[in-house]
Structures are given as C-alpha cells and as structure tokens.
Amino acid sequence: MSDARTSRIELNVTTDENKVPTSIRWSAGDAGIANAEAKAFALSVWNGREALSIDLWDKDMTVDEMKVFVCQSMMTLADALERATQDERAAGAIRGFTSELAERIGVGPAAE
C-alpha cells in the first residue's frame, strides 16, 4: 500500500475588464495558508527540457515593490539551488549578483 498523497497550492486572480489583475489570492493547505493576499507571483515549472513561467502582479504594485520582489525572488532561487545541489559557489554567485543589482536599482543596502 502506498503512502502517496497529493498536496494542493491554489492561486486565484481577479481581473478587470482589460484582464489586468486587481486581486491575487493564494492558498496552501499543508502550510496552513488560506486565501492570503499577494501583490505578485512568479511561478516556474520545469518540464524536463525548459522552464515555463507565469508572472503576474496586481495593478497597484509599484515599480519599487517590483524591484524588491525580483531581488528577493532571485535570492530565494539561490537558496533553492544551494539546497538542491549543495553548490555553495554557484548560489553565492547568484547572491552576489543580486546584491549588486539591488544596490544599482536602489533597493539594496546602499539605498537605505
């Protein structure tokens, strides 16, 4: 008998008449998250050959918020790479680049 189970992560996007997102909500039952509000999401999946992605943000998200979101997302990708591969050097390179980018675009330590 198998102990396999299925987990569900759900994203709900409300759009205006022009199909621009006005509200993003998400749930992840296993994490205890139900109908939580989000301003943006970046979903990437790997089909064995290429990464496919869906990136959405609500119409009220500011340019500065998007810059922070992108830099934070890049840092979490570095963390995921390190956990999956134990390649500290590659993850460190991503973190270094991201830190430099954050400073250059005004959302890093030099901007504070």
Regions found by a protein language model. Give the residues of each.
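Acidic surface patches and DE-rich sequence motifs
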Residues: 16
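Active-site- and interface-proximal helix/loop "cap" or "latch" segments in soluble metabolic
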Residues: 4, 22-86, 90
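Structured beta-strand/loop patches that form or line metal/cofactor-binding pockets in enzymes
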Residues: 1-13
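C-terminal charged interaction modules
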Residues: 79-112
